[in-house]
């Protein structure tokens, strides 16, 4: 069961959850989330998900090395995104790194932070479709505990400024 949202109660402030992944359009989601935070007086929470496969015990040492490398990559990606958020609105975003199924990790992050008021994703504008995360989320979007905003991946900063 989802936690009661407290974003606008006294002593709380609304926060936007944005997913930082390896797609080319992640920057559009980060830009929109930053602009939203400026306008709403809220904050930005950046989530990076490391997708893990079932580990074969025989290869556990290799899996540990791969996990450590994935964590370093996740930190580097969040560093880039945090620089972008800070450059847009002088906001210091919260950072979360999780491992596992992306949809389950997003839902768990939302459940654990009652101040999260919005999930922002960006869609790939190309012919290959909106991207794997959006494809996964659309299957359960009707039961999401917070609103989901999908930003078109080909919107410019100026376009997003006008919309947010």
Role assignments for model-derived ranges:
Residues 1-11, 86-119, 162-164:
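Structural beta-alpha unit
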Residues 118-143, 155-160:
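Glycine-rich, Arg-bearing micro-motifs that act as flexible, cationic patches
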Residues 32, 69-81, 105:
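Short, solvent-exposed amphipathic alpha-helices that sit
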Residues 29-32, 108-109, 136:
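A short acidic, amphipathic alpha-helical/loop segment
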Residues 6-60, 143-146:
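Small/aliphatic-rich secondary-structure junction motif
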Residues 45-47, 94-98, 149-151:
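General small-molecule cofactor/ligand-binding pocket signal
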Residues 37, 85-86, 140-141:
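A generic structural signal for well-ordered alpha-helical segments
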Residues 6, 48-76, 158-164:
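Acidic, proline/glycine-rich short linear motifs
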